[in-house]
């Protein structure tokens, strides 16, 4: 059992490579369309928010909105839920950050020269060179800004990936073969200990998402994470700031219900008015 995450530059050919590897390995292929559809299952409102915020750099105002924070939390919970299923190719969505340190996950970035990216877009989308260049610049700026805001890192920094491939210097067939082999090498790393790390991360993300999207939970700051990475017996920690003291009990009850037998601790503080607190998604 293994996982492949692919971050790609727009027009690099990364999407085709991801599909090809998924087909060769008979892995599930999870892309933007599937994740947005899953988020929409939380309600039509969240489906609309997903379309509004997806892969775009939010404005200074938007980044503090309840809807943006809820969208990010839902997106991360869905990615980790798919990762639990194994045998999956996850396209983008910050999967490389969410699965950092998971030994049976192979995290790659695919890039290409500007000239090759423009050529692909002119052929695929029927754009002229000027419009293709403009679109690439816009997408790079929006996606790069969104990733930096959420994860605090540059999305094209090689240190956040196991491998970086360049379709301008390597043939797609060679990249596909290499990626396939590397994914298969990681199957043996799917140990019980490694799986517990992923399970606890996924549980924390599920709790965070459930709290984040509930409009009756007046949260101005939120941090939900494993208390000790991979150690289920220590459970998860929920920290936050609320501006309605009566909501604390409901938040705690919701988290406990999701966690079941897994321990959960709380550090929820009350402040009498809402503040622009920090939400931890990294």
List where the protein language model places each region.
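Conserved phosphate-donor/acceptor-positioning beta-strand/loop module used by diverse small-molecule
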Residues: 101-124, 132, 136
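Divalent-cation
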Residues: 92
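N-terminal targeting leaders
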Residues: 101, 119-123, 148-159, 164, ...
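Glycine-rich phosphate-binding P-loop
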Residues: 4-21
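Conserved nucleotide-binding/hydrolysis micro-motifs of P-loop NTPases
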Residues: 95-96, 112-117, 169-171
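Short hinge/gating elements
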Residues: 3-6, 61-65, 164, 190-194
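ATP-dependent small-molecule kinase phosphotransfer cores
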Residues: 35-87, 127
